């Protein structure tokens, strides 16, 4: 990779950062990220990064969303003031992505605010994965590479999930993702229409499509409280599905999600490691992990060398 690139990380996901740097045959850069006694974030870059191409590995999701975001911003400011040539924020899971529009009176558009903060901090480029709303790329005036976990998910399905399958979109917004996967697997497609009373609470579900005597695969970008996911699973079983799997990019797993999963009819929840979840996975044997470190490291390598990354979206063999 040469000596003009540096991989740094905050505290959000040091394990993933280490895997990425190992995959690139690079030593993880020396940066101390902690807190002062009053709770403010403390950052110290402990080696020269002058004129280097610097990549900050820092998801801005749970459990400490705001701390992770502030670490990213303060690290970027420190790196910029240390005369780095270019700063790329690698944000595998982009926090506040669900706040992408005014869905009620006097509501903020926090996704846009976060984009503004990232640019103001001096970041030149963003690499992320499966944005909850792809239009968030338009919130930025800098390049944003939105990678997809779909190739790795398709590989997992082909290798580990036998039987006649039907790909299920858990809502209308996910139909494009589900259709893409069903086409590549030559599988049927079903859609769940859900009515919400409020966030994270579904009042009713309607299934469009046939799942009888098939293995149902729910595909989505995020599993948060898992209430909707578990309800969808039980409905699919009641409609005749032989098994139900869920394949999700970001395993947020907040609240009592683990308890819900353990008590559900779900066979497996397959998530990537965009968010650290080892402790939660230890409490739920249904959780399986797809490692996306190589996808991110390859995107970094190609970005550093000025190469196209589009082929990363299509390698499903």
Swiss-Prot record:
It holds the Pfam family Pribosyl_synth. It catalyses: D-ribose 5-phosphate + ATP = 5-phospho-alpha-D-ribose 1-diphosphate + AMP + H(+). Its EC number is 2.7.6.1. GO terms for biological process: 5-phosphoribose 1-diphosphate biosynthetic process; purine nucleotide biosynthetic process; response to bacterium; ribonucleoside monophosphate biosynthetic process. Signal peptide: none annotated. SMART domains: Pribosyltran_N. Its cofactor is Mg(2+). One of its GO terms (molecular function) is ribose phosphate diphosphokinase activity. Pathway: Metabolic intermediate biosynthesis; 5-phospho-alpha-D-ribose 1-diphosphate biosynthesis; 5-phospho-alpha-D-ribose 1-diphosphate from D-ribose 5-phosphate (route I): step 1/1. The keyword Aminoacyl-tRNA synthetase does not apply. CDD domains: PRTases_typeI (cd06223). It is an enzyme of class 2 (transferase). Belongs to the ribose-phosphate pyrophosphokinase family. This is Ribose-phosphate pyrophosphokinase A. The gene is prsA.
């Amino acid at each position: 990779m040469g000596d003009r690139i540096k991989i740094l990380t905050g505290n959000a996901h040091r394990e993933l950062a280490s895997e990425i740097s190992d995959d690139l045959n690079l030593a993880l850069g020396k940066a101390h990220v902690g807190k002062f006694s009053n709770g403010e974030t403390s950052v110290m870059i402990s080696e020269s990064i002058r004129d280097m191409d610097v990549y900050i590995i820092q998801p801005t999701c749970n459990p400490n969303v705001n701390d992770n975001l502030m670490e990213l911003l303060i690290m970027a400011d420190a790196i910029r003031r240390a005369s780095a040539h270019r700063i790329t924020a690698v944000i595998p899971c982009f926090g506040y992505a669900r706040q992408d529009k005014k869905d009620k009176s006097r509501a903020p558009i926090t996704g846009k605010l976060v984009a503004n903060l990232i640019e103001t901090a001096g970041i030149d480029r963003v690499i992320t994965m499966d944005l909850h709303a792809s239009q968030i790329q338009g919130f930025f005036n800098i390049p944003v590479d939105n990678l997809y976990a779909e190739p790795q998910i398709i590989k997992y399905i082909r290798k580990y999930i036998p039987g006649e399958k039907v790909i299920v979109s858990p809502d209308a917004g996910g139909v494009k993702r589900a259709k893409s996967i069903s086409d590549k697997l030559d599988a049927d497609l079903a859609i769940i229409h859900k009515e919400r009373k409020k966030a994270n609470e579904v009042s009713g579900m309607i299934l469009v499509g046939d799942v009888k005597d098939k293995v149902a695969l729910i595909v989505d970008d995020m599993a948060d409280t898992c209430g909707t996911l578990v309800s969808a699973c039980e409905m699919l079983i009641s409609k005749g599905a032989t098994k139900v799997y869920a394949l999700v990019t970001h395993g947020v797993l907040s609240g009592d999600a683990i308890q819900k999963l353990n008590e559900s009819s779900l066979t497996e929840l397959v998530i990537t490691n965009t968010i650290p979840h080892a402790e939660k996975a230890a409490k739920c044997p249904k959780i399986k992990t797809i490692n996306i470190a190589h996808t991110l490291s390859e995107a970094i390598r190609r970005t550093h060398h000025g190469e196209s990354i589009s082929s990363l979206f299509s390698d499903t063999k």
